[in-house]
C-alpha cells in the first residue's frame, strides 16, 4: 500500500486575539497554529488506535497521525479493497464517514453511498472494523441502515454516530431538503433500533426526530448539513454542530459552523440565545472567512469533530479551504477549551499530545 508523509510545522505569531464565540482569549500570549493536513474533505472525528490518531474522510480515505513521530501517514483509499457491498448499487460515491468504537478493538465506519445526487438518492451503511497488529481491517456488511430517494425526506448523507450516557447509540444525518434528523441505532447490530427492515423516513414515523433547519438568509433553500453531536463526558450537555450555506467552491465556499446544546440526544437543541436549532437557531462557532480565528486562511470551515485525548484534553477538527494554497481542502486540528459550558478554539496552546 502506497504511503505518503506530510510534514507539518507549528507557526507562532505574537498577536493579541480577542474573545469571541468560537475562540478563547489568549490573554496576550502567543497565538498558535493548528495541525494542518492538506487534501482532506469531510473528515470524521479522530480516534486513537495504538500510538496513532486515525482520520477518515471523503471519499473514504484514511491517514494516521503518529504520536511518536508527530507526522501524518497516508494509509489507504479503498475501504472495501474492491469488494464493495451490493447495497451501494454498483457505482455509488462514498462520502463523509463517521467512526464509532463499539467494543475493545472493534469499530464501525458509517458512510453514505450516493447513487443519484440530483434526486437525493442515497443510502447510509457501515463497515465493520477489527484492530489487528495496530491496523483496522474493514469488512463490508451486506445490508444498509437508512435511505432516501427524494427531496421530501432527509437526504441520507453526512452520518454521525455517537453513544449517549445510557449506552444507546444514535445516528444524526441529513442535508438540505428536510434538514437534520436523528434516529436510534442498535449498538449490537449497528442497524436501526426499531424495525430495521423499514429503512425509509416518513413524516409520521416517530423513530425519527427533527433537530435542525437552516436559519440564514444567503439562500432560499434549506442549506444545512454536516451535523455532528458531541456527548460531553463531564457535563449534562450534548452539543450539536451543523454547517450552514455551501461548500465545495474553494475560497468561494460559504460554509460556516453553528452550534446548539441540549440535555437530551434528541433535543431540543438551543443556541446561546435560547433559539431552537429546529427553527433555524444556531450560534456562530466558526465563520466562513476566518474572522473568528483571526486568520483569513481558514475559509469555509465544515464537518466538525471532537477528539478527547487520554489526558482529558479536547481537540476540535474540521476541514477548510486553504486560502494560503489556492483553496485546497484541508484538515485543521485545534485545542478546544470549554468556557461557561460552551466550546471555544484555544489558540493560546500549541497542539501537542502528552
For every predicted segment, state its role.
Residues 8-18:
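Bacterial N-terminal signal peptides
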Residues 20-354:
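Carbohydrate-active catalytic/glycan-binding domains of CAZyme proteins
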Residues 1-8:
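Bacterial N-terminal signal peptides that target proteins for export
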Amino acid at each position: 500500500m502506497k504511503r505518503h508523509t506530510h510534514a507539518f510545522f507549528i507557526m507562532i505569531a505574537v498577536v493579541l486575539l480577542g474573545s469571541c464565540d468560537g475562540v478563547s482569549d489568549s490573554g496576550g500570549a502567543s497565538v498558535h497554529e493548528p495541525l494542518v493536513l492538506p487534501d482532506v474533505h469531510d473528515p470524521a472525528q479522530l480516534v486513537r488506535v495504538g500510538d496513532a490518531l486515525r482520520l477518515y474522510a471523503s471519499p473514504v480515505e484514511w491517514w494516521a497521525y503518529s504520536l511518536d513521530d508527530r507526522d501524518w501517514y497516508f494509509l489507504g483509499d479503498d475501504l472495501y479493497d474492491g469488494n464493495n457491498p451490493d447495497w451501494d448499487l454498483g457505482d455509488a460515491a462514498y462520502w463523509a464517514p463517521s467512526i464509532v468504537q463499539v467494543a475493545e478493538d472493534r469499530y464501525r465506519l458509517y458512510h453514505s453511498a450516493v447513487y443519484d445526487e440530483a434526486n437525493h438518492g442515497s443510502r447510509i451503511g457501515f463497515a465493520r472494523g477489527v484492530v489487528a497488529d495496530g491496523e483496522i481491517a474493514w469488512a463490508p456488511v451486506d445490508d444498509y441502515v437508512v435511505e432516501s430517494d427524494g427531496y421530501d425526506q432527509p437526504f441520507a448523507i453526512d452520518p454521525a454516530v455517537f453513544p449517549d450516557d445510557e449506552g444507546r447509540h444514535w445516528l444524526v444525518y441529513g442535508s438540505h431538503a428536510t434538514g437534520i434528523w436523528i434516529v436510534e441505532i442498535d449498538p449490537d447490530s449497528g442497524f436501526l433500533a426499531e424495525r430495521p427492515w423499514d429503512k425509509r423516513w416518513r413524516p409520521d414515523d416517530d423513530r425519527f426526530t427533527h433537530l435542525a433547519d437552516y436559519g440564514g438568509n444567503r439562500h432560499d433553500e434549506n442549506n444545512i448539513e454536516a451535523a455532528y453531536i458531541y456527548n460531553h463526558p463531564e457535563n449534562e450537555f450534548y452539543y450539536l454542530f451543523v454547517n450552514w450555506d455551501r461548500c465545495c467552491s474553494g475560497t468561494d465556499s460559504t460554509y460556516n459552523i453553528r452550534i446548539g446544546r441540549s440535555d437530551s440526544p434528541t433535543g431540543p437543541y438551543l443556541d446561546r440565545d435560547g433559539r431552537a436549532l429546529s427553527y433555524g437557531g444556531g450560534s456562530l462557532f466558526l465563520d466562513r472567512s476566518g474572522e473568528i480565528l483571526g486568520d483569513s486562511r481558514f475559509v469555509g470551515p465544515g464537518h466538525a469533530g471532537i477528539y478527547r485525548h487520554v489526558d482529558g484534553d479536547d481537540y476540535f477538527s474540521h476541514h477548510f479551504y486553504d486560502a494560503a494554497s489556492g483553496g485546497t481542502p484541508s484538515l485543521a486540528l485545534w485545542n478546544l477549551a470549554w468556557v461557561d459550558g460552551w466550546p471555544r478554539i484555544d489558540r493560546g496552546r500549541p497542539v501537542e499530545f502528552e
